[in-house]
Amino acid sequence: MQGLVLQLTRAGFLMLLWVFIWSVLRILKTDIYAPTGAVMMRRGLALRGTLLGARQRRHAARYLVVTEGALTGARITLSEQPVLIGRADDSTLVLTDDYASTRHARLSMRGSEWYVEDLGSTNGTYLDRAKVTTAVRVPIGTPVRIGKTAIELRP
């Protein structure tokens, strides 16, 4: 009888250990691959309608600057038209990056804010080390990484 209790205790402890490991891995996975769009959108909504609105318009992004990669130093003057980024010849910003897809990402203006969205690329688009899964607001000076290329919005 004591042998049976000991075996059941061991099996129960082993099962609890595996449940703990599984929960830790699940939490790590959600932290690493969590979409950041909701948090960024909430921050944008909280600032709308305050005194920062006028300040943001004054310091609105006017340029898209390549800060890392083969095109470092390249600058695009922004208009209200979306900016297509990728290796395709008809992209606004044509990348020679092996890790960029043909149609990799799109920067588009919504109101007075710029948003980046991944267009189903293979290697993903990152906003300040967070993977972009939905359209996410891009603050001025925050790097957007596409492969080995990093771009920023500048006033």
UniProtKB/Swiss-Prot annotation:
One GO term describing the cellular component: extracellular region
InterPro entries in alphabetical order: Cell_Proc_Reg/RNA_Proc (IPR050923), FHA_dom (IPR000253), SMAD_FHA_dom_sf (IPR008984)
Chain ranges passing through the membrane: 6-28
Subcellular location: Cell membrane
Effect on the protein of changing T36A: Lack of phosphorylation
One term of GO molecular function: mRNA binding
Statement: the UniProt record of this protein carries the keyword Calcium: no
CDD domains found in the cross-reference section: FHA_FhaB-like
Post-translational modification: Phosphorylated by PknB. Dephosphorylated by PstP.
Annotated positions of the Phosphothreonine modification: T36
Disulphide bond pairs: none
Pfam families for this protein: FHA
Result of changing R87A: Impairs interaction with PknB and PapA5
Keywords, sorted A to Z: Cell membrane, Membrane, Phosphoprotein, Transmembrane, Transmembrane helix
Subunit structure: Interacts with (phosphorylated) PknB via the FHA domain. Interacts with PapA5 via a phosphoindependent interaction involving N-terminal residues preceding the FHA domain.
Protein name: FHA domain-containing protein FhaB
Organism: Mycobacterium tuberculosis (strain ATCC 25618 / H37Rv)
Primary gene name: fhaB
